[in-house]
Every structure is written in structure tokens, then in C-alpha cells.
Amino acid sequence: MHILKDSLSITVSSGDGGAGCVSFLRERFNTKGGPDGGDGGRGGDVIFKVKANLKSLSLYKNGQRLAANNGKPGMGSRKSGASGEDLVIFVPPNTCIYDVATGSMLFELQNFDDEVIALKGGRGGLGNVHFKSSTKRTPRFAQPGESGATLNLRLELSLIADIGLVGFPNAGKSSLISTITASKSRVANYPFTTRFPHLGVLKASYNDLVIADVPGLIEGASQGIGLGFEFLRHISKTKILVFLIDVASDNFMSAYDILVNELSAYDIGLSSKKRIIVANKLDLEGAIENFNQLKRALVGERVLGISIYDNTGINELVSELFALSRI
């Protein structure tokens, strides 16, 4: 499949080191003891880690600022401050991390066990116990903690969609992907609203599925008519196809045949992929009758009816997509 890109920019900061402590030993029988100030704790690191079941960057928002915790200051009795908690940023496999300032790629995380420290936390300052000498028996100073660092980063994810939405222009693909995911595709009542692949993520507690709404298919796409080659290349490596058919239109029966024929003409493997036939616009006049006719004609196919207008069948469709992804 032509690789689709998802990207966002974030600002990350590692934690400051805690300050060293100025303290002197004070005991019942030793009121003028020596220095015993402990060291400050280390600031938290910024760590990027691949999480196996993530399929998108949707855990984060574009422009979000994220920071590790600062180290705690040192204490008396030579006690060191606690280290700051690391900031762990979970990303999907195939995520590249770029420095916004230079445009250079800093890290590439490809595999499920990949992990990288992007920024080290600041070192904790030394307590005054370290500065005692023969000439300075009561040092009344300690080191401040080292400051953490900040980076403006761009995360870029190479995506191969799990599900491809297949349908004629205005079949309702953009509206469907907006309904079943958090995505908002541009919707208008004319052909080729979707000029470029548009991605959404179906989220569940155990898995995410990436769904691609790509430019509408028309007859002759396999010969390059319309956005043909571009469209077919985008869906060639998806695991599941959703054939979206407008059953309120006059040509609903021929739409299925054209979709199958165009996919087969481009790549014989496309027409044999796991698929669901989804009859859309059941809320419109005559659509229910056409839907029943379509089901009778397509014995052996998974055929579901939906209405994006009133959400009829949407939950059933989402459940079926997750079920198919596990087969």
C-alpha cells in the first residue's frame, strides 16, 4: 500500500535536578556537628517507547506540552532527594521523531520493543557535605540542581490502514468515517470530496483499527480514470474492505458489480479480501426495499444496512469490523 502519514508536533521537557541541601549535624551532645546536607534527586528523563497495540498518535494532541517531573531537593542527615518520575511517551511501531528546529530525524522506532531516551533529566545538586575541607569546615552552600532540557519535536507515523472504505463518490464514506471514529472528514454534496486519503481510528480497549477513507472509485478506475490508480494503490494492502453502497440511488445493484470488477481488474487479490457490504442511507425513501433486494442478490456476502443520519446499524458495523480483524 502507498504509505499514509500521520504527524503531530509536541514539546517535551526533562525534569530539573533537585537542589543540594545545606544542613549541619545537630545532636543532643553534638550541637556543632559537621555538614550533612544530602544531594538533590535526578530530574526525570523523557523516554519514547513502542506500545504494540497502538495504531495511531491519537493519545496526544498537536501542540501539546509534556514534561517529566523534577527531582526533589536533598535533606539533612545526608539523605538524597527522590528522583523525578520519567515521562514515558508511548508510540506505535514505525514512528519517526524529528527535531522541529533543524528538521533532522533524531530517532526511528520500528519494533515492538524499541525504546529511546530522548532527553536526560538534570543532575541533582550536591549537598554541602561534599564541600567540607580543611579550610571550610562549615560550608554554608550547596549546588543547585541542573536544569532539564526542552525539545520541540514532530512525530511522524507511517500507517498501513487495516480497513479500506470502497465506494462511489458521495456513497457516504466521509460521513461514515466521521461517525464511527473521532475523525472529521470534509463533507460536501459533490463527487470527489475526499481528494487525499483520510484516516480515522476505531478504538477499543484491546485494539485499535486504522480505517482509510480514500478518493471515491468510479468505473474505469483500473485504467486510471478519475483518481483510479491512486485510489487502488491506497487500498491494496488493507486487511478488510468495506463496500459502501448508496441504496437510495437508482444504480445500487450495478454499483456492487462495478466495484468488484474494478478491484479485480487492478489486482485479482483485492476482490478476494475479507469484506463487508454496507448498504447506506436506509432512512431515505425506497432504501429499505432496495436493501432487501441487495441482500437477496448477494447470498453468501456479509451485508449490513446502516443510516448515518439516525445511526441505524452503526454499532453492529463496528462490532463486525473488530470481529473480522481477529479472524
Curated annotation (Swiss-Prot):
Keyword Ribosomal protein found: no
Intracellular or extracellular location(s): Cytoplasm
GO biological process: ribosome biogenesis
Cofactor(s) of this protein: Mg(2+)
GO molecular function annotations of the record: GTP binding; GTPase activity; magnesium ion binding
Superkingdom of this protein's organism: Bacteria
Domain (OBG-type G) ranges: 161-326
Gene3D superfamilies: GTP1/OBG domain (2.70.210.12), P-loop containing nucleotide triphosphate hydrolases (3.40.50.300)
Domain Obg: 2-160
Binding-site residues, GTP: 167-174, 192-196, 213-216, 280-283, 307-309
Broad class of enzyme this protein falls into: hydrolase
GO CC terms of this entry: cytoplasm
EC code(s) of this entry: 3.6.5.-
InterPro entries xref list: G_OBG, GTP-bd, GTP-bd_Obg/CgtA, GTP1-OBG_CS, GTP1_OBG_dom, GTP1_OBG_dom_sf, OBG_GTPase, P-loop_NTPase
Residues involved in Mg(2+) binding: S174, T194
Keywords linked to the UniProt accession: Cytoplasm, GTP-binding, Hydrolase, Magnesium, Metal-binding, Nucleotide-binding
Subunit structure: Monomer.
Task of the protein: An essential GTPase which binds GTP, GDP and possibly (p)ppGpp with moderate affinity, with high nucleotide exchange rates and a fairly low GTP hydrolysis rate. Plays a role in control of the cell cycle, stress response, ribosome biogenesis and in those bacteria that undergo differentiation, in morphogenesis control.
Protein family membership: Belongs to the TRAFAC class OBG-HflX-like GTPase superfamily. OBG GTPase family.
Protein name in the entry: GTPase Obg
Originating organism: Borrelia hermsii (strain HS1 / DAH)
Organism placement in taxonomy: Bacteria, Pseudomonadati, Spirochaetota, Spirochaetia, Spirochaetales
Gene label: obg
